[in-house]
């Protein structure tokens, strides 16, 4: 990577932006171990620069929560959510609240707590203003839920929806932005 040797020359905010994008790149490749390393690197960078209570740190921690979920580290995922969710609620950040609920749903499904998962999803948030990348993440966890509860028709429908999105121009443009 040509950027890596020049990272130290960037401002702390730009370094965080770069490392966050790197973590997102790995996340969308389903490479959760490297995504984890990237987001932990971002967290350490922000801590070293006294940026503990910034949007960048909360963004880092919500991303860590999702990565921990995908690595099966449910306690770590929950701890990260418990730390960031009050901040996003206080800010009225509906996109981040949607993402927190998505991760909480994923944790409940992964832990086999289907009644809790159903309760979380009973809140029908309007996702028309939510970036589709986050809707797609929610759909991934909903597919798992439907598979585990035996509703294969709904799981299959969501899979087809995700495939259509992943083949779309919007998705390709999103990947190009992430790769940059």
Mark where each language-model region is:
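Amphipathic alpha-helical segments of tetratricopeptide repeats
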Residues: 2-8, 40-50, 82-89, 122-128, ...
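Residue signature of alpha-solenoid helical repeat architecture, marking inter-repeat boundaries
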Residues: 13, 53-55, 95, 132-133
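Residue register of alpha-helical TPR repeats
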Residues: 17, 55-59, 99, 137
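Hydrophobic positions within repeat-based interaction scaffolds
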Residues: 115-118, 122-180
